[in-house]
Amino acid sequence: MLDPKLLRNQLNDVAENLKKRGYELDTQAFTALEERRRTLQTACESLQQERNTRSKNIGKAKAAGEDIGPLLQEVDNLKSALAEAEQNLQALQGELEALVSAIPNMVHDDVPAGKSEDDNVEISKWGEPKTFDFEVQDHVDVGAAIGGLDFETATKITGARFSLMRGDIASMHRALTQLMLNTHIDEHKYEEVYVPYIVNKDSLYGTGQLPKFEEDLFKLTDDREFYLIPTAEVPVTNIARGEIFDESQLPVRFVAHTPCFRSEAGSYGRDTRGMIRQHQFEKVELVQLVKPEDSLNALEELTQHAEAILQKLGLPYRKVVLCGGDIGFSATKTYDLEVWIPSQGKYREISSCSCFGDFQARRMMARYRNSETNKPELLHTINGSGLAVGRTLVAVLENYQREDGSVEIPAALQPYMNGKTVIAKA
């Protein structure tokens, strides 16, 4: 959530910044609600003051032996008027909060202009796409040849956009997860956390999925308003909700491996084949909680941590900075890592690493105690995938495929697969 003071004092500047997203801030609606809020706030304060004055007069009149009946009636009338005014103010503040909650984060100054992913700017590339001397197969056909990817049975069990893995491919999926976790824990010094896969509305509000993106979520059909997590970002970042950290504890680095569940409501007809876009998939998620002055450097660091996995696996990728029109609702700056997919002849997103400034922290009231002022201040939050496990599996199957239908196991994965060097149909 944006700082209400910023909206009150620099509304036009905020509106101008949000235009980089293609978002038109309704300044008139905000101004009208804010003026009504100030009027009601003033009325409440005036009624409170008048009630307090009249209450004191009752004591004086009683001491002087005067009839206090009329004064008691006046105080009762003021109490009723104040209660009504406070109720109206509370309702108006709810309207104002709903409006502000739907406003996306401001983008950082160096975020490029643009309307869509076509306008994202490439920052760097690593590795060279392999040249094959045979016809490249996509991961669906590679998996079918090995006998380890079964979409038909998954569809029978559940429906479209689910997958079933078995044998060496299931083992490779697990090995990728272990490689990611061990790298981030042992080398990058993240603390592993195990979190709930079901969250409440407050958690989803805190990270910015609610109220705007409810259609993308799987909601449990009971009266508790629980949801399956769309990303580990939600439960992991919400560890900080309502907390005040000592400055000496920062930065806090968490890593978690979880399944993720998304309805893909806006993706009808896109990536319907294979594992690229699934209702259920797994990720290893990185989250950092830092002081405001450290957040942009932390974004660079976290992105490098995600890149390290791709480099260990020898997978060609590129790094792009998202333009204003493609950046997420809560983010102020985002890098995407896109891995080379040979069957498609292009790079596809495998990790999105974002700095949120204090946007999520304000919604969650996640703070740290400034050692100089001894006052609590809002944290900055950063998160990213390190990496999406299923898409990494796709990239390995395609980039390491061989003409005979087998798949070479990257050296970094071999210790996690009992020293195997190749997977092939049994």
Curated annotation (Swiss-Prot):
GO terms for biological process: selenocysteine biosynthetic process; seryl-tRNA aminoacylation. Its EC number is 6.1.1.11. PROSITE patterns: AA_TRNA_LIGASE_II. Transmembrane segments: none annotated. It is found in: Cytoplasm. The keyword NADP does not apply. It catalyses: tRNA(Ser) + L-serine + ATP = L-seryl-tRNA(Ser) + AMP + diphosphate + H(+); tRNA(Sec) + L-serine + ATP = L-seryl-tRNA(Sec) + AMP + diphosphate + H(+). L-serine binds at T231, A232, E233, E285, S385. The keyword NADP does not apply. Keywords: Aminoacyl-tRNA synthetase, ATP-binding, Cytoplasm, Ligase, Nucleotide-binding, Protein biosynthesis. One of its GO terms (molecular function) is serine-tRNA ligase activity. Pathway: Aminoacyl-tRNA biosynthesis; selenocysteinyl-tRNA(Sec) biosynthesis; L-seryl-tRNA(Sec) from L-serine and tRNA(Sec): step 1/1. It is an enzyme of class 6 (ligase). Its main location: cytoplasm. ATP binds at R262, S263, E264, E349, I350, S351, S352. One of its GO terms (cellular component) is cytoplasm. InterPro entries: aa-tRNA-synt_IIb (IPR002314), aa-tRNA-synth_II (IPR006195), aa-tRNA-synth_II/BPL/LPL (IPR045864), Ser-tRNA-ligase_type_1 (IPR002317), Ser-tRNA-synth_1_N (IPR015866), SerRS_1_N_sf (IPR042103), SerRS_core (IPR033729), tRNA-bd_arm (IPR010978). It holds the Pfam family Seryl_tRNA_N. Homodimer. The tRNA molecule binds across the dimer. Consists of two distinct domains, a catalytic core and a N-terminal extension that is involved in tRNA binding. Belongs to the class-II aminoacyl-tRNA synthetase family. Type-1 seryl-tRNA synthetase subfamily. Catalyzes the attachment of serine to tRNA(Ser). Is also able to aminoacylate tRNA(Sec) with serine, to form the misacylated tRNA L-seryl-tRNA(Sec), which will be further converted into selenocysteinyl-tRNA(Sec). This is Serine--tRNA ligase. It comes from Saccharophagus degradans (strain 2-40 / ATCC 43961 / DSM 17024). The gene is serS.
